[in-house]
């Protein structure tokens, strides 16, 4: 996992030399800690391997839209966003793979969840749904869900019918009022939208496209450049 590199990174050097880093899964730890320690924008999404093996041109176009054009929209254009809990929220985006985010809740290399919009996805539903539940309870017991402004769930579903959404809602148990949405355009799937970590976004469950960026991550000019 990329968290094994944390103590060896020179965060001041990284901050003075902003580039782009983009990845998913195990890269979740690296992108979030760089944003936390430096204030730079990093990205959750496609990587060079995905672009090279994607039989469609979605990954390539998505990278151009985010890194070059600074698009405020999340692809694809026809993506369905589903409301789980109504509401509106504004905040900086943080998140990625649930198992890795859980490991950044407390400690020297923790991240600040205050007033953030948290996005989560998870592959482990196939093998360890109980473990996923434990991760979420750990986050709940350490106050994560009291701090965030909104939640965006990747719609990964195991063939058994178990969904990340169901496990999350069981853990939250109606105790929180922030808006919750889900979509199927990020995480361990072929077509990955690129999500800029540290950029402000807005959730509005009354809209067809229920989440959008409200600042341009390219114009901000504080991102890190080396796709993994």
Per-region residue spans from a language model:
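Short, acidic/small-residue loops that bind anionic groups at enzyme active sites
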Residues: 9-34, 41-47, 177-180
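ATP/nucleoside-binding phosphotransfer catalytic cores, i.e., glycine-rich phosphate-binding loops
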Residues: 155-228
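Glycine-rich, charge-decorated loop segments at or immediately adjacent to ligand/cofactor-binding or catalytic sites
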Residues: 28-39, 189-197
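Long, hydrophobic/aromatic-enriched structural stretches that serve as scaffold segments
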Residues: 1-8
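Conserved anion/nucleotide-ligand pocket segment
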Residues: 39-102, 106
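Buried hydrophobic positions in well-ordered alpha/beta secondary-structure cores of metabolic enzymes
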Residues: 26, 101, 151, 198-201
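Structural motif
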Residues: 19-20, 40-43, 91-92, 116-118, ...
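Internal helical hairpin/lid segments
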Residues: 109-164
């Amino acid at each position: 996992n990329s968290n094994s590199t944390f103590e060896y990174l020179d965060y001041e050097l990284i901050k003075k030399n902003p580039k782009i880093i983009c990845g998913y899964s195990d890269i979740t730890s690296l992108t979030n800690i760089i944003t936390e320690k430096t204030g730079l924008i990093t990205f959750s999404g496609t990587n060079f391997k995905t672009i090279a093996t994607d039989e469609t041109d979605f990954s390539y176009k998505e990278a151009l839209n985010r890194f070059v054009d600074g698009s405020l929209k999340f692809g694809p254009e026809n993506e369905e966003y589903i409301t789980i809990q109504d509401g509106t929220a504004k905040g900086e985006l943080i998140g990625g793979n649930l198992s890795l985010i859980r490991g950044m809740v407390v400690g020297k290399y923790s991240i600040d969840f205050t007033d953030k919009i948290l996005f989560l996805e998870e592959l482990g539903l196939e093998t360890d749904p109980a473990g996923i539940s434990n991760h979420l309870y750990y986050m709940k017991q350490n106050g994560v869900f009291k701090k965030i402004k909104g939640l965006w769930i990747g719609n990964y579903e195991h063939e058994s019918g178990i969904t990340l959404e169901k496990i999350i809602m069981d853990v939250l148990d109606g105790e929180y009022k922030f808006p919750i949405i889900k979509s199927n355009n990020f995480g361990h799937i072929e077509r990955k939208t690129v999500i800029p970590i540290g950029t402000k976004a807005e959730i509005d469950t009354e809209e067809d496209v229920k989440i959008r960026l409200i600042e341009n991550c390219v114009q901000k000019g504080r991102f890190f450049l080396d796709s993994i």
